[in-house]
Amino acid sequence: MFAQVIQGRTKDPAAMWNRSEDWDRTLKPGAEGFLGSTAGVSDDGEVVVVARFESEEAARKNSDRPEQGAWWAETEKLFEGDVAFYDSSDVEISWGGGSDEAGFVQIMQGRAQNEEMRARWKEAEAEAEEWMRENRPDVMGALAIWQGTNFTNVMYFTSEEEARKGEQQQPPEESGESGQDDWMEQVEDLKFIDIKKPYFSSP
């Protein structure tokens, strides 16, 4: 799998939503290798789009289409300031990788201090999986996109209300979930982006 992350700011979330719908109608049918996307705007205007493709080649072919270039030229006008692009084939899927039925998406971004710290995260996540499945029915899946030790983690929830309730639970140490909490305390430049009205696109 290959993932593209597009990130910036806008003052017009409704127009951004319309551009996503336009892409679905006019460009998705010709996007070979497209696996799906998650997009949205936070309450303070931060835009995040996560698009998934079968391969880097498929993503490049999509980007090189003239109609894709024309669509982006119009969409780019809705952003304020610079737009950041992150591409990666280093993608990890957890708990099924998410769902288009999610009512709330939370994006966590940051930087692990080193590769060893990244490995510890993977171990803690594996240890926590059983507890999460049994005690956090609000979690519908997750996707982690890595660029070296920089990461974008996309978590899918049934709803924001259920996600907040789930956050209040105190898992036992042996579950592995507490290890994830300890890990996050060491992450550099940690930030959370809440997408309360996610837009999903599927092939």
Regions found by a protein language model. Name each.
Residues M1-V48, R52-P203:
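Short S/T/G/P-rich N-terminal loop/turn motif that feeds into the first structured element of a domain
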